[in-house]
């Protein structure tokens, strides 16, 4: 809940600034403002998640008890995601209906009160809801690693995920700082560069920490596979959604003959990438 509150406060503070930067200075400056605001939410989610796990572990000292922490995070994610989604969609539909039936009031006109509710719903659902969802996933991943590590390696298996997650946060902070310092010609390539930088730092740290904690490089190899699969999934998503590649161009050509061919082409392109998104994590585990 604290991460969601911080995210909504930062979102409302950075929205207008991002718009002003886009009008006055262009895309590059607006991207920096948007990235800085989004980074606050990301670091709040990871920071609160890791802090909560560390505090609970220091108090109880038993990794199996930590699963209750994950259940609490899942409950908040459920209410924030579902409740925020229902509110957002209700306000969105209401605003669209007013724009259709009221003469002289176009869609997203600020004179329509439902438009304000729609914007509030976007913050609740897309910021607080998604932040709670990511918080639950992040905490669950750390806790499951700690429980499995404790059952196999004892205290070393508990400390390793905590230390590596802390290094990951520091690597992300460094990558975000480098992003804000450079001039962005292509937003997508600049964002991908932050992923590559933070991933490389985590890889180096894993090869240093794995022998110290376990006496071998097996954990580091698993981390390498996980990072590579994550990057591969992102690249495959880009191939099927970017206008640079043939799939999107083919869907655009099919759309010229009507909505039916657009839907058919979209489904035929989406099914293969769904298969790869399902099988790649499974192959990674195997």
Predicted regions and their residues:
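Hydrophobic packing and interface segments
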Residues: 1-278, 283-284
């Amino acid at each position: 809940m604290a991460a969601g509150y911080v995210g909504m406060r930062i979102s409302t503070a950075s929205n207008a600034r991002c718009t002003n930067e886009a009008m006055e200075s262009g895309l590059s400056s607006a991207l920096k403002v948007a990235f800085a605001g989004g980074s606050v939410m990301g670091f709040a989610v990871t920071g609160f998640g890791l802090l909560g796990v560390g505090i609970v572990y220091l108090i109880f000292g038993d990794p199996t008890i930590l699963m209750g922490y994950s259940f609490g995070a899942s409950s908040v994610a459920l209410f924030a995601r579902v409740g925020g989604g229902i509110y957002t969609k209700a306000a969105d539909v209401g605003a669209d209906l007013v724009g259709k039936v009221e003469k002289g009031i176009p869609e997203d006109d600020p004179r329509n009160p439902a438009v304000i509710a729609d914007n509030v719903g976007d913050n609740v659902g897309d910021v607080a809801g998604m932040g709670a969802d990511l918080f639950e996933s992040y905490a669950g991943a750390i806790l499951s690693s700690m429980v499995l590590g404790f059952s196999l390696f004892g205290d070393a298996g508990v400390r390793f995920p905590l230390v590596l997650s802390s290094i990951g946060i520091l690597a992300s902070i460094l990558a975000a700082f480098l992003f804000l310092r450079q001039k962005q010609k292509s937003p997508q390539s600049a964002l991908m560069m932050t992923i590559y930088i933070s991933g490389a730092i985590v890889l180096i740290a894993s090869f240093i920490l794995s022998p110290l904690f376990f006496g071998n490089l097996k954990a580091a190899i698993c981390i390498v596979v996980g990072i590579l699969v994550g990057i591969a999934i992102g690249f495959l998503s880009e191939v099927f959604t970017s206008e640079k590649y043939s799939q999107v161009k083919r869907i655009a050509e099919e759309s010229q003959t009507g909505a039916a061919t657009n839907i058919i082409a979209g489904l035929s392109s989406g099914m293969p990438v769904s298969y790869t998104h399902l099988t790649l994590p499974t192959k990674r585990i195997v």
